[in-house]
């Protein structure tokens, strides 16, 4: 192994080999964290009820109520950081991923507006890198990033008020290494529901039967001189080559939920005719254009903020990079629906596609074959 990749545990934690001089930044972060904690210590949440939530792996979402029951609560979550090797396509391409709870994307968290999110963030000593978490739904301290820097073996607890309603990205944002961590899979989403639940913007309630979470991820896997994807012994060894690919702004893969085909075949998203489905879709880094082939977005919050009235009857919706969006659809016909990023090169060539497998009875009034294909 070359000297470039012979990083000691200490140098990796400090970021000396891969992120420049981070140690002064860590000191500044610690001082800022102490000041911020002191300023907010007067907030009394001890009297609020507490709810502990067990998160589940996407595309599924933990049990929750769509309308708040009672007043604000403290909702407790735990995320454990896991650095792990994953396979991202049928050709066996490997990536040293950085993950929350072992999945790409990390789990979707659900609370109600004005609840308090209390997150325990664990960086086990089996990891090699420093991490943190930035919630786009939070106010202050770099979205919590300044208060949650954890070295391997560290645990921290962050609490913030979910004051804005919508779906929001969260991601790792350690000093000097943000894009590397984000494009290595370290991102997820949180849904902050209005206390009265979703509405159509005209005061009418919208309720869903199912919710699925699709996390779109761009990966940047280096190739060797023969064009084959390279493999590495560790996440640190891959850093320099990965950074070169990242700087081209040209992903090797753009996938849903961590791998090409992860939400197809036996893993397709399930629904039935008449079911109302909410699709939460995040992209922490690049713009995307979700489209449900054969269906629509009955109600769409493309930038994910529920205070805004939804767009209706959408064919394709635009989600800017660093954003989560939400789309609601009532399935009307059975069959296999492809759900894609409608940059079709990214969908068909790079992997940004999923399937909905929908059961039920066919409605000839909506579509029928008048004449089957045949010779003239």
From Swiss-Prot:
An annotated GO BP: denitrification pathway
Kindly list the GO molecular function terms attached to this UniProt entry: copper ion binding; nitrite reductase (NO-forming) activity
**Which Pfam family, just one, is annotated for this protein?**
Cu-oxidase
Q: Which Gene3D superfamilies match?
A: Cupredoxins - blue copper proteins
Cofactor: how and how many bound: Binds 1 Cu(2+) ion. The Cu(2+) ion is held by residues from each of 2 monomers of the trimer. Nitrite is bound to the Cu(2+) ion site. Pseudoazurin is the physiological electron donor for the Cu-NIR in vitro. Binds 1 Cu(+) ion. The Cu(+) ion is bound within a single monomer.
Cofactors named for this entry: Cu(2+); Cu(+); FAD
> Where is it localised?
Periplasm
Look up keyword DNA repair and say if it applies.
no
**Plastocyanin-like domain location:** 98-193, 258-359
Q: In which pathway does it act?
A: Nitrogen metabolism; nitrate reduction (denitrification); dinitrogen from nitrate: step 2/4
EC number, as in UniProt: 1.7.2.1
Q: Which UniProt keywords apply?
A: Copper, FAD, Flavoprotein, Metal-binding, Nitrate assimilation, Oxidoreductase, Periplasm, Plasmid, Repeat, Signal
- Summarize where Cu cation 1 binds, as residue positions: 131, 172, 181, 186
Q: Identify the enzyme class.
A: oxidoreductase
Describe the reaction catalysed, as an equation: nitric oxide + Fe(III)-[cytochrome c] + H2O = Fe(II)-[cytochrome c] + nitrite + 2 H(+)
> What family is this protein classified in?
Belongs to the multicopper oxidase family.
**How does the entry describe the domains?**
The type I copper site in NIR plays a crucial role for electron transfer from pseudoazurin to the type II copper site of NIR, which comprises the catalytic center of NIR for the reduction of nitrite.
What subunit structure does UniProt give? Homotrimer.
State what protein this is by name.
Answer: Copper-containing nitrite reductase
Q: Which organism is it from?
A: Rhizobium meliloti (strain 1021)
């Amino acid at each position: 192994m070359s000297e470039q990749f012979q990083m000691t545990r200490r140098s990796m934690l400090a970021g000396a080999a891969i992120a420049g001089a981070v140690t002064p930044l860590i000191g500044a972060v610690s001082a800022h964290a102490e000041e911020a904690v002191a300023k907010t210590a007067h907030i009394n949440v001890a009297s609020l009820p507490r709810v502990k939530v067990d998160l589940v792996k996407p595309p599924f979402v933990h049990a929750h109520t769509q309308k708040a029951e009672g007043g604000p609560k403290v909702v407790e979550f735990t995320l454990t950081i896991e650095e792990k090797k994953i396979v991202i396509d049928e050709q066996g391409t490997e990536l040293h991923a950085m993950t929350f709870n072992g999945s790409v994307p990390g789990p979707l968290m659900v609370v109600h507006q004005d609840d308090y999110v209390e997150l325990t963030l664990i960086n086990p000593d089996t990891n090699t890198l420093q991490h943190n978490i930035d919630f786009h739904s939070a106010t202050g301290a770099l979205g919590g990033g300044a208060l949650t820097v954890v070295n391997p073996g560290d645990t921290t607890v962050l609490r913030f008020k979910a004051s804005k309603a919508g779906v929001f990205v969260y991601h790792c944002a350690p000093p000097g290494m943000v894009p590397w961590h984000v494009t290595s899979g370290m991102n997820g989403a949180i849904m902050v529901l209005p206390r009265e639940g979703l509405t159509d913007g005209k005061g009418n309630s919208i309720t869903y039967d199912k919710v699925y979470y699709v996390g779109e991820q761009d990966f940047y896997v280096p190739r060797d001189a023969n064009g084959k994807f390279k493999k590495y012994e560790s996440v640190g060894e891959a850093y320099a080559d990965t950074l070169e690919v990242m700087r081209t702004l040209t992903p090797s893969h753009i996938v849903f939920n961590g791998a090409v085909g992860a939400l197809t075949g036996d893993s397709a998203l399930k629904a039935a005719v008449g079911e109302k489905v909410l699709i939460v879709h995040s992209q922490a880094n690049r713009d995307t254009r979700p489209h449900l082939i054969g269906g629509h977005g009955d109600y769409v919050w493309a930038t994910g903020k529920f205070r805004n009235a939804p767009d209706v009857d959408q064919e394709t919706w635009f989600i800017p990079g660093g954003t989560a969006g939400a789309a609601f659809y009532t399935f009307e016909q059975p069959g296999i629906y492809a759900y894609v990023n409608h940059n079709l090169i990214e969908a068909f060539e790079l992997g940004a596609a999923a399937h909905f497998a929908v059961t039920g009875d066919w409605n000839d009034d909506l579509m029928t074959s008048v004449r089957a294909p045949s010779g003239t």
